[in-house]
Amino acid sequence: MRIQLLLVATLVASIVATRVEDMATFRTEKQWQQDLQYRREFVKRQLAPKPKSNIVVSHTVSCVIDGGNMTSVWRFEGQFNPHIASEVILHDTSGLYNVPHEIQNDGQVLTVTVKRSAPADIAKVLISLKPVQLSSGQYECRPQLQLPWVPRPSSFMYDSYRLWYEKRWLTIILYVFMWTYLVTLLQYCIVRFIGTRLFYFLQRNITIRFTGKPTYNLLTYPVKG
């Protein structure tokens, strides 16, 4: 029993020591957001200009609808190879695969201009440009841009950050071991003391019921009468 108590005390001391060490390095959510922004800028810096690679850093969209005509302009900033004109494909949901468009490219700025009528059956216009996919709703030229290499903050990412970068997983492992040990110890106590007494109590009552004589043992006393 002394060894078991010593083990419990050791586990509790380890958990307390781990928590104290983590307090100095724990970062708030605001600090984590700043670190995430720094990592975004670091990724952008790592995307150095390379030949034959198209990289999108930022973009702007403008749209003008005059009567039944729609003029939309997508302006991308980054790095684009001279053959980007053959890699940009526009299509919509009405079945028209290659939407007529104009492309201007100076290597750092790519401008895609679409001039066409906007009938009711036009649901959206997609621009296939790696690694970007743009979409616009009906009579709307404000596509949503999603860059796959820019992470979006979420509670799951923040919890994972705390677990792995701040060594919180050690605390969780210690908690699991501690609670497993406590449950096992509680089960042992129940079986060793309460279960044994209950067994002898039932055995004594059965013996008295069928023989009329009480059974003497170290845990119970004979019934008088």
From Swiss-Prot:
One of its GO terms (cellular component) is membrane. Keywords: Disulfide bond, Glycoprotein, Host endoplasmic reticulum, Host membrane, Immunoglobulin domain, Membrane, Signal, Transmembrane, Transmembrane helix. Residues 18-170 are lumenal. Residues 192-225 are cytoplasmic. One of its GO terms (biological process) is symbiont-mediated perturbation of host defense response. Its main location: host cell. Disulfide bonds join 63-141. The chain crosses the membrane at residues 171-191. Residues 54-145 form the Ig-like H-type domain. It is a single-pass type I membrane protein. It is found in: Host endoplasmic reticulum membrane. Residues 1-17 form the signal peptide. Glycans are attached at residue 69. Belongs to the cytomegalovirus US6 family. This is Unique short US7 glycoprotein.
